[in-house]
Amino acid sequence: MALELAAASLLGAGFTQADRLLDLSTPLGQDRLLAERLQGTEQLSDGGFVLHVDALSDDAHIPLKAVIGQPVQVKLQTALGRDEHRVWCGLVSQARFEGANGGFARYRLRVEPWLALLRQRRDSYAFQDLSVIEIIDSVFGDYNGQGAVAPQWRWEVKDRDTYAKRSLTIQYRETDYAFIERLLAEEGLFYWVEHEAGDGEPGTHTVVIADHNGAFEAGPQASVKFQRADATETEDTIQAWRQSRTWRTNAVRLATWDYRAMQARKASAQVDDKLPNAMELADSDYPGQYLFEDGDQGDRLAHNALAAQRLRQSLYEGEGTVRTLAPAQRFTLTGHWGPSQGAGADFVVLRIRHDARNNFDESLGRAVAQALG
C-alpha cells in the first residue's frame, strides 16, 4: 500500500524535475523520465565521457528504440546557484529496462558523445597527401547527415602548418574510432568534449582537439579549497588529495627510412631532469617508412612521445564535491597543509568521476528503494 501511495504522491506532484539536483531531458518529452542517479567518467581523449543515468518513470512500457541513438541532456545543479548547472549533452548508446514495481519503472541510459558511433564502423582506406587535420576532418565529416547525428568539432592548435601532408596514411581493418585515436596519439594531439545546454530540449556537444597547454582554461570555480566535509560549507571543496610519482622512460629515439632520399632519418628527445641516480631508459622505435621528412618533424614527434611518457611521472588525485570541474579545466588548489602536495599551484583536470543522486524526499526515496532496490 505504501508503494502505491508513494507513486501517487510522485504523480500528484506532476512528476516534475523542477528545482531538483539532477534534470534529464529526452526526446520523449519533459518529465517522462525522472533522473534518479548519475554515474559517469570524463577524461582527456579516450572517448571523452561515458554517463550512466538511472531514471524513473510511471510508464513501464516505454519502447527502448524510442531513445536509442537520440540526443539527451543531463543537468546537475551546482553550489554556484539554483540556476547554475553543470551540463552534459550526448547520444544514448544503450538503453535498458531495469524493472517495475509499485507504480515505478526504472530505466538505465548510457550517454556518450557522437564519437562513440565511430566504434561501430570498421573500414580499410588509403589517405594520400593529406595532413592529419585534413584526414580527421574527412572521417568526421562523413558522419554528417546520418540519422540524428550532427557531429561538431573544433581545432585548437597553435599552428596548422606544423602538420605537414602525409604521403600515405593507411586505415587497415580498423574502426574509425581506433584509427582516429591512433592518428591523434602519433601527432601529440588530445581532445575533450564541451557541452552547450539547450532551452527545454537536449543541447549540443563539441569535440575540441588541441596540441598545447594554452588551450586549457579556468572553469567556473577557478580556485578550489582543500577542506574537510562540512554541512555548513556553502562552497564545493576538495576533501582528499594524494600525489603519486612513477619512474618513467626518460628518452625517446625514432628512426625511419626516407625512400625518396634513399637514406635513414633519426630523431630523439631526452629529459634534462632525471631522477637522482637514474639510468637512461630509452624507448626506441622504428614506426615505418617515411614517418617524417626532415629533422624538425622528427624532433617534434620524438618530443611528443616523450611528453606522453612524462605526463604520468607525477600525478595528483582528489575527492570532493566540486561539481563544476571538467576535463581540460585549470584550477588552483588553496588551503592544503602541505606545499609539496601542490598547495597554491595550478592543476589541469585529466580525468574525473561523478556520482550523484537526486534530491528526493525521504518517503519517496524509501519507497523507490523498497520497490526497485
Model-predicted segments: where are they?
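Amphipathic alpha-helical and helix-coil boundary elements used as assembly
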Residues: 1-373
